[in-house]
């Protein structure tokens, strides 16, 4: 059996700042010990400190990842840039940089070892050892059985979580349940993917049993224990792992017995999770509004019925001794520069196009990828792509003309920077050029944005998981240092109830329960505002906008489920995992091309090609583009200025302002151009333009606007008249250029061996007895021989 050398030193303690039930005095006394005194395991507070230490090192963190410690969380990282979500080649799809240990242009990333093999707090196996040490210590202490179960149950979930993060990449990894001697000769065999799967499921079943008495009725959903791992957390993580185990990445034969067993277990677990008070967040008496869908990410305590695996944060500023700061950086990342945000994140135009239309069907952009889904009868216009879309579109993307308020103000006395008070902030990110010759250049980045965004502008912004008008941060304006949204305490949901339903839908479909599987998707759609039947003229649909064939054809059912995952879980760090699990880069048709691959790696289930089976166009060979809305060439040639001199509000670089002052402005009511009779000032220009703004924070947006008291769809139609008069959509080159812009026409290239990752050279050097995975080179350049899928 293959072996592993693990070299580790040290133990330490750190406060888990998200849990106020921990004693600050105790934590201050116990910090920075290299070894935990066994006596602490006879004291509940001491044991809680050990548990909190494990939480602090293992909880998901939107400020990190994807790396050995954290998964992707939805930003434009190396994994998300391998999907439809972002342009720019991520590490696994770059056609110019083939990955391999020795002969590759670039070495594969390390998700197995970690930053420092000799520091228990900075590597994978140190974190696992830390958890094992706490389990052994607490079980050997003098606490009551009830107290031990509450603490150890949480540790079992943490251990399963750590194993899941390496298992999903490497399949077969060492299983370590104790704390072996720390010495060079300490060797642990590498187990198979099946053995690791069974180990994780056993840990989670044990955790669920331990935690059911104290959390099975939802007791920890409120108070100081909110966000601690519970029975529901254990079952939710088990649900995710089972979905992976049933998918073709690990189930090449399409083993029906495996799928049926997982389906039975997952369905029983769902009943327990429901009984604990969890479900899709739908406020009683409010209908299904997209504002509520967006606010789902901002809830805490009893209101939060959606979050099943949660990381909490605070607004404490860093630098304290000890440092208890734990800030969620997401809001800072996604906000534009003229709010004192980090500048924003730019999603691709590709996924924007794939989003459903208002009748639930796909437009031409979506049909390019999904051939089995219902085609929309609603017109799609790339110039105004926000018209007639699935309601979730409007709380995922930020485009010119939306109101995106925040607390505080970024304005500074005597400057033109950041010209809005937070409660009135409007995103106007249309762009212009300095040179008319660049207006049609799809590769030029020499653009300037409105409202002093200037060269910091993005054509499209990501707004998903913004706190919106909940303001879960301590805003720091320019007068106080300008840190903006840095100190945010918004929680982060790694697993939420919607994913739970979609995981079960996948497996139910595989077990032949197509109607049941579609029923779970309908729940997601209904929460997003769809109805069983919509009769509004021009937007008629049945069946919540789903294709009827999903209830009778397995491939179509899977396509509908995976499509709903792509939309509902967009920009939450899940898409690359889904594409790997379902082999969507090439359908899994090329495993035989991997050097040394056994016959058992050949995909037999799903017709031997998952892409053909579900009607999805393989992602290999595709490109992603970006989008911007530029001032039309008929408006001052699409050309404006590059700066806005301090104190000169009336000397704006915006060509639209110059144009309307001289030629008249669009009237929001009549749609006609009328003479400009007001003062030619920034204040008057802003007031006029604000008449076209869509107030998404203040309005209820549903997919049947006939029932909405405030019709945001009508507001969007009015905004479209502004676009059609002053702006035009321009596709900007996303993929396809190298650093010196001499290579054109590059396309997504994901190699078959990337589905099951191999170890990089640094990992193998530190573990010379660790044999490489089939398809990857060892550190001597030889071919790997370890088969993680062997049983």
Residues covered by each model-derived region:
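Conserved, well-structured interaction surfaces
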Residues: 43-52, 56-67, 90-170, 185-198, ...
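An aromatic- and glycine-enriched ligand-binding surface/loop that stacks and positions planar moieties
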Residues: 23-94, 205, 232, 240-442, ...
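C-terminal substrate/ligand-recognition segments
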Residues: 383-524
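Bacterial Sec-dependent N-terminal signal peptides
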Residues: 3, 16-42, 200, 239, ...
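Short coil/turn linking the two alpha-helices of tandem helical-hairpin repeats
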Residues: 167-168, 172-174, 215, 244-253, ...
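Long, intrinsically disordered, low-complexity segments
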Residues: 22-23, 124-125, 199-201, 225, ...
């Amino acid at each position: 059996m293959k072996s592993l050398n693990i070299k580790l030193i040290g133990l330490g303690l750190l406060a888990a700042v998200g849990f106020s039930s921990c004693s600050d005095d105790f934590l201050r006394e116990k910090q920075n010990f290299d070894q935990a005194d066994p006596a602490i395991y006879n004291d509940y507070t001491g044991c809680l400190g050990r548990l909190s230490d494990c939480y602090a090192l293992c909880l998901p963190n939107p400020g990190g990842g994807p790396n050995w410690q954290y998964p992707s969380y939805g930003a434009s990282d190396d994994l998300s840039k391998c999907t439809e979500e972002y342009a720019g080649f991520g590490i696994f799809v770059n056609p110019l940089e083939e990955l391999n240990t020795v002969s590759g242009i670039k070495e594969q990333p390390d998700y197995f070892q970690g930053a420092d093999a000799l520091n228990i707090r900075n590597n994978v196996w140190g974190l696992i050892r830390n958890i094992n040490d706490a389990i052994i210590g607490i079980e050997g202490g003098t606490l009551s059985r009830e107290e031990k179960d509450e603490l150890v149950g949480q540790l079992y979930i943490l251990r399963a979580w750590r194993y899941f993060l390496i298992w999903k990449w490497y399949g077969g990894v060492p299983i370590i349940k104790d704390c072996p001697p720390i010495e060079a000769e300490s060797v642990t065999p590498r187990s198979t993917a099946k053995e690791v799967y069974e180990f994780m499921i056993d840990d989670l079943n044990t955790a669920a049993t331990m935690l059911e008495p104290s959390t099975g009725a939802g007791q920890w959903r409120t108070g100081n224990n909110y966000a601690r791992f519970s029975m529901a957390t254990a079952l939710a993580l088990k649900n995710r792992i089972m979905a992976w185990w049933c998918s073709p990445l690990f189930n090449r034969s399409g083993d029906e017995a495996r799928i049926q067993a997982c389906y039975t277990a997952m369905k029983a677990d769902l009943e327990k999770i429901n009984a604990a008070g969890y479900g899709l967040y739908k406020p009683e008496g409010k209908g299904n509004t997209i504002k509520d869908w967006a606010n789902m990410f901002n809830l805490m305590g009893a209101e939060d019925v959606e979050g099943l695996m949660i990381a909490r944060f605070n607004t404490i500023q860093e630098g304290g001794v000890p440092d208890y700061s734990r800030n969620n950086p997401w809001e800072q990342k996604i906000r534009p520069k003229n709010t004192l945000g980090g500048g924003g994140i730019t999603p691709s135009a590709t996924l924007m196009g794939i989003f459903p239309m208002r009748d639930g069907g796909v437009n031409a952009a979506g049909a390019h990828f999904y051939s089995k889904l219902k085609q929309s009868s609603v017109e799609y216009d790339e110039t105004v792509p926000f018209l007639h879309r699935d309601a979730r579109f409007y709380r995922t993307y930020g485009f010119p003309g939306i109101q995106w308020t925040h607390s505080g103000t970024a304005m500074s006395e005597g400057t033109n920077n950041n010209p809005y008070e937070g409660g009135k902030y409007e995103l106007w990110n249309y762009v212009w050029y300095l040179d008319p010759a660049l207006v049609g250049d799809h590769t030029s980045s020499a653009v300037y944005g409105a409202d002093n965004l200037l060269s910091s502008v993005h054509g499209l912004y990501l707004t998903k998981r913004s706190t919106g008008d909940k303001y879960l941060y301590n805003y720091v304006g320019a007068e106080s240092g300008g840190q903006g949204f840095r100190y945010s305490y918004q929680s982060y949901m790694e697993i939420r109830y919607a994913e739970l339903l979609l995981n079960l839908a996948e497996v139910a479909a595989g077990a032949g329960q197509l109607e049941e599987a579609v029923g779970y998707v309908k729940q997601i759609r209904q929460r997003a505002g769809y109805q069983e039947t919509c009769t509004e003229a021009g937007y008629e649909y049945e069946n919540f906008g789903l294709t009827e064939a999903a209830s009778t054809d397995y491939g179509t059912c899977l396509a509908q489920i995976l499509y709903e995952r792509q939309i509902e879980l967009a920009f939450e760090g899940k898409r690359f995992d889904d594409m790997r699990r379902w082999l969507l880069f090439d359908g899994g048709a090329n495993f035989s091309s991997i050097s040394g691959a056994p016959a058992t790696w050949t995909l037999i289930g799903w017709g031997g090609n998952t892409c053909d089976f579900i009607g999805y166009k393989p992602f290999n060979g595709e490109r992603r583009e970006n989008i911007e809305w530029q001032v039309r060439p008929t408006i001052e040639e699409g050309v404006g200025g590059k700066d806005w001199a301090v104190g000169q509000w009336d000397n704006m670089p915006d060509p639209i302002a110059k144009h309307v002052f001289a030629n008249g402005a669009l009237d929001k009511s009549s749609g006609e151009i009328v003479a400009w009779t007001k003062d030619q000032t920034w204040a008057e220009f802003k007031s006029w333009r604000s008449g076209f703004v869509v107030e998404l924070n203040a309005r209820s947006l549903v997919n049947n606007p006939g029932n909405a008291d405030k019709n945001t769809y009508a507001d969007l139609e009015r905004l479209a008249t502004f676009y059609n008069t002053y702006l035009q959509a321009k596709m900007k080159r996303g993929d396809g250029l190298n650093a010196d812009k001499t290579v054109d026409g590059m396309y997504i290239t994901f190699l078959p061996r990337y589905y099951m990752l191999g170890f990089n050279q640094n990992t193998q050097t530190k573990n010379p007895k660790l044999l490489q995975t089939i398809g990857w080179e060892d550190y001597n350049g030889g071919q790997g021989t370890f088969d993680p899928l062997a049983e």
